[in-house]
Regions:
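Short, flexible loop segments at the rims of nucleotide/cofactor-binding pockets, characterized by
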Residues: 41, 70-76, 103-113, 184-186, ...
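Long, well-ordered amphipathic alpha-helical subdomains in the mid-to-C-terminal portions
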Residues: 198-224
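G-domain G4 guanine-recognition motif of GTPases
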Residues: 67, 97-103, 130-147, 164-172, ...
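C-terminal effector/interaction modules appended to NTPase cores
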Residues: 11, 19-25, 218-430
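Conserved C-terminal guanine-recognition region of P-loop GTPase G domains, centered on the G4
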Residues: 52-60, 79-162, 197, 220-236, ...
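Charged, alpha-helix-enriched surfaces in structured cytosolic catalytic cores
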Residues: 22, 26, 41, 45, ...
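Canonical P-loop GTPase G-domain recognition
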Residues: 126-133, 138-197, 206, 235-244, ...
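Conserved G1/Walker A P-loop phosphate-binding module
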Residues: 1-78, 82, 86-87
Length: 430
């Protein structure tokens, strides 16, 4: 991640759906005013979802997702369509693009008036309650009277769904399409802070950032950057230190430290250094609350005590990165899991968008903080785990639990602390 770029997971995700050669890529280029997507008369130019980071004013930072055609053919085409459908799990706004000139009279009169393939994805969009706009593209190919007739037919069958008529050739209708996107965009100001709601003006927040072989050269990792920015936005003061200098840092600050936020991997060492009077949590736990469901992830950690020999454990990460010899997902967590349970477990890992379709074989899922994932994608993964009856826990919560400091690590969140007492999830007595 660039130090100056908005994280992809925090951008408004706008997915574009339609048949091959409906003009999806042309619409992307016209809306952004840039040649971001390849435009070709050859069907199926877009073979996989293509992600384009972009600023669209006044929405702000967006991620435009150009998906494969809904009418793609063959076994490979079927897999491409499946990938396009999976994009809905992270979508904030959908654009359903039609070539209005190719709609037959029969298609106009059937169902929602937009064609069978389009109606199938439309039903999925509505089922997921994703706001969307119907884009009638290539309007320049029709006479005005015929265009108006078709537009009215589609509007009559689709209730309050915005319907925009555009021509990417003549550059008409684009302002109305942008207005529709602005109207449908989520209010990002209502999004839960990472830590800002826990910070008062002039509060000193101590961040413990280990610099080891896994740390990127010359910069901080994404969750650290984002927490610092959230503290600044709420007029707090960030003090960044490493584990060896933490004690001296706290001594220098005296009673000014409001809280300590650490990399979860250092939970054990940091907990011994930080006085009990200072609240302690981790970047990973903050992101569990920010993008996931903290209560569900805390409840899932107790499954650790029920694991048996031969159980399959999935360790999942939202990003892809080069693995190091002391990688947290493939080395450290499996080691802590084995050390804590004493069981012979089958550990499997996945990263990026490669989250398994079938979760039922797993006895437990241990997921990263999801800093690179869109909030909807992270919550969808948690929901799917719940549907499959598989306990899911976050890296930070798992590490705090096996290190015996779970209660302390969530004391900043009264509802979660109360849950631990109610459910008798108390690592201190074990």
């Amino acid at each position: 991640m660039s130090l100056t770029a908005t994280p992809n997971g925090d951008r408004v995700q706008i997915a574009i759906y339609g048949r091959r050669n409906a003009g999806k890529s042309s619409v992307i280029n016209a809306v952004t005013g840039q040649q971001l997507a390849i435009v070709s008369e050859v069907k199926g130019t877009t073979t996989d979802p293509v992600y384009k980071a972009m600023e669209i004013l006044p929405i702000g930072p967006c991620m435009l997702i150009d998906t494969p055609g809904l009418d793609d053919e063959g076994e490979l085409g079927k897999k491409r369509i499946e990938k396009a459908v999976q994009v809905l799990n992270r979508t904030d706004i959908a654009m359903l693009v039609l070539d209005i000139s190719k709609l037959t009279k029969w298609e106009l009169e059937q169902g929602r008036g937009i064609g069978r393939k389009e109606q199938q994805i439309q039903e999925m969009i509505e089922e997921k309650k994703i706001p969307y706009v119907i884009v009638l593209n290539q309007s320049d190919k029709l006479e005005p009277e015929e265009l108006e007739y078709r537009r009215r037919c589609i509007m009559a069958k689709n209730g309050t769904v915005p319907v925009c008529t555009v021509s990417t050739v003549q550059k008409t209708g684009l302002d109305k399409l942008k207005d529709a996107l602005v109207m449908l965009a989520p209010d990002t100001d209502l999004k839960l802070h990472i830590v800002g709601d826990l910070v008062n003006e002039n509060d000193v927040i101590v961040l413990v950032v280990p610099v080891d072989s896994a740390a990127p050269k010359g910069r901080l990792i994404m969750p650290q950057q984002q927490v610092i920015r959230d503290v600044l936005d709420n007029h707090g003061v960030s003090v960044v230190t490493q584990v060896p200098t933490l004690a001296a840092t706290l001594e220098m600050l005296g009673d000014k430290a409001r809280m300590v936020i650490t990399d979860s991997q250092a939970f054990g060492e940091v907990s011994e250094i930080v006085p009990q009077r200072i609240p302690l949590t981790s970047f990973s736990i903050l992101f569990a609350r920010h993008k996931g469901n903290l209560q569900t992830l805390v409840e899932g950690v107790t499954a650790t005590d029920s694991l048996k020999d031969g159980d399959r454990i999935l360790i999942a990460e939202g990003c892809t990165h080069r693995r190091q010899c002391d990688d947290i997902g493939t080395v450290k967590i499996p080691h802590w899991l084995q050390e804590y349970t004493g069981r012979k477990l089958q550990i499997e890992t996945c990263s990026g968008t490669g989250f398994p379709t079938d979760l039922s074989p797993y006895s437990m899922i241990i997921h990263c903080g999801g800093c690179t994932l869109h909030e909807k994608e992270m919550k969808h993964r948690i929901f799917r785990a719940q549907q499959s009856g598989v306990p899911i826990v976050n890296y930070g919560i798992f590490i705090a639990y096996v290190k015996g400091i779970l209660r302390r690590s969530v004391e900043l969140f009264p509802d979660i602390s109360e849950l631990l007492k109610k459910e008798k999830i108390d690592e201190a007595d074990r």
